[in-house]
Amino acid sequence: RSTYVLWGLSQECLARTLWPLGTFLKSEIRDMAVSYGFEHLAKKSESYDICFIPDNDYRAFLNHRIPGLEKQLEGGSFIYKNNTVGRHRGYPFYTIGQRKGLEIAMGHPVYVTAIDPDQNRVYLGDASDLMDRFLKVRDLNLIKYLQLPDNFTARVKIRYKDPGAMATLHQINQQAEVVFHQPVSAIAPGQSAVFYEGDDLVGGGFIAPLDSKVIKS
């Protein structure tokens, strides 16, 4: 599963990489880096993925990093079936596919299906509204191939814990069109789409937003 975050590596990087670190402690690796003249790397601060945010509270994380953000953006519209159904706390605090924490009573489950940053609008819909078969990938990086074969079939993961779904890929320069064989849920622009052939990591890229400025599934 950890290969999901490695799609951006090149063959040049992989050729110089030793796996795994095994029984070495991180402190020992830092000492090794210093001994080889990479003191600036050894002293770098820890890096954390967003999944390490305390209590998974990205709203508190954003408010801490950008003081006044919520006050600046609160009061935008929740839109459901072209009607305004409530007010939200600011579009950055919501993600495609989100159901919990919306703080709006609709009488039935609703999900974030689209986000319009320019208008500070968050669009809501039913679970079926999240389903789609198509996405585009930008900043394509390939590890296994120099160029994707024609009508290439791969297992595509669109989030870290996603088991993946089969799709047909068509490469266009540094982009790719991905057509899933069955609809998948909550395709979110900005997330990584990662391609596998069996257990082999083929490559990946970032899910591109649609031509519209509205970010949707």
What does each of the following model-derived ranges do?
Residues 1-217:
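Nucleotide-activated chemistry modules centered on ATP-dependent adenylation/adenylyltransferase
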